[in-house]
């Protein structure tokens, strides 16, 4: 089985006023991949000055890691009220170039953990998608503008980005931002073969093969930071093993519930 990969910027996250801690899609996705035992590779980027703080917690998860040095480290502050989140972008992370993708040649499925629109330009995604590689993009890479300050989503993304995407994962507010609704026609208009909309404790919606299917979830206690990243990683593990999209979402829902409840 060819390995799955997660690529993206690591971040420093401050949750509810606490001390900064490692974050970013690669870190949260790696937690799910470790639990599921799927051969995988993690490629990350951040400033070298933060390497000692960010890299060891990721390496301890047991997956091979490719480090790419950047000019900055993405830094965020979060606060939560149930499923509602307020977020402050303190510093943007670096952009990924085609050269940063070296070492991913054998990968079949790639989770692109964009934290902002500037992380993965269309040219970089086009390179990732070569050779029938399947690219799964986090909707943060469409809706989060490349500016610091309180996070305000918008739909000013480059449509060329979606030409290279096989799976698009959107949070509910991201879907509403870019297409206005979360219904079948709205998600179809994106032109992506598979679209998964996560609804927090209410589960998810899966659009695939022209049909929209709801996937329920049971509310789970725990810090939800990174739950979407873990969900997408678990979803891709099942898809790469031959499971259908809806079945993959159900399995991913169970994995996230286990991680939030610290049962896995």
Predicted regions mapped to residue ranges:
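Conserved N-terminal subdomain of the carbohydrate kinase-like
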Residues: 2-3, 12-20, 35-114, 118, ...
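Active-site metal-binding loops of divalent metal-dependent hydrolases
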Residues: 8-10, 230
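Alpha-helix C-terminal capping segments
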Residues: 30-39, 238-241
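Conserved beta-alpha-beta core of the PfkB/ribokinase-like small-molecule kinase fold
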Residues: 109-185, 203
């Amino acid at each position: 089985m060819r390995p799955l990969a997660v690529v993206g910027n690591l971040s420093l996250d401050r949750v509810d006023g606490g001390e900064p801690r490692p974050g970013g899609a690669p870190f949260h996705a790696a937690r799910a991949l470790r639990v599921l035992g799927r051969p995988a590779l993690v490629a990350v980027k951040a400033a070298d000055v933060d390497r000692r703080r960010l890299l060891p917690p990721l390496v301890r998860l047991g997956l091979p890691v490719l480090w790419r040095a950047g000019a900055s480290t993405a830094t965020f502050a979060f606060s939560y009220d149930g499923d509602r989140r307020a977020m402050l972008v303190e510093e943007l992370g670096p952009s990924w170039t085609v050269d940063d993708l070296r070492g991913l040649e054998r990968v079949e499925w790639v989770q692109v953990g964009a934290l902002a629109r500037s992380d993965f330009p269309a040219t970089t995604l086009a390179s990732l998608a070569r050779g029938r590689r399947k690219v799964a993009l986090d909707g943060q890479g469409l809706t989060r503008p490349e500016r610091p300050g309180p996070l305000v989503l918008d739909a000013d993304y480059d449509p060329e980005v979606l030409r290279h995407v096989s799976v698009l994962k959107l949070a509910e507010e991201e879907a509403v931002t870019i297409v206005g609704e979360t219904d079948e026609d709205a998600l179809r208009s994106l032109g992506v073969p598979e679209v998964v909309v996560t609804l927090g404790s209410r589960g998810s919606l899966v659009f695939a093969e022209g049909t929209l299917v709801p996937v329920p979830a049971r509310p789970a206690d725990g810090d939800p930071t990174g739950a979407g990243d873990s969900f997408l990683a678990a979803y891709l593990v099942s898809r790469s093993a031959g499971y259908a999209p809806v079945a993959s979402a159900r399995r991913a829902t169970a994995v996230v519930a286990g991680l939030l409840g610290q049962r896995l």
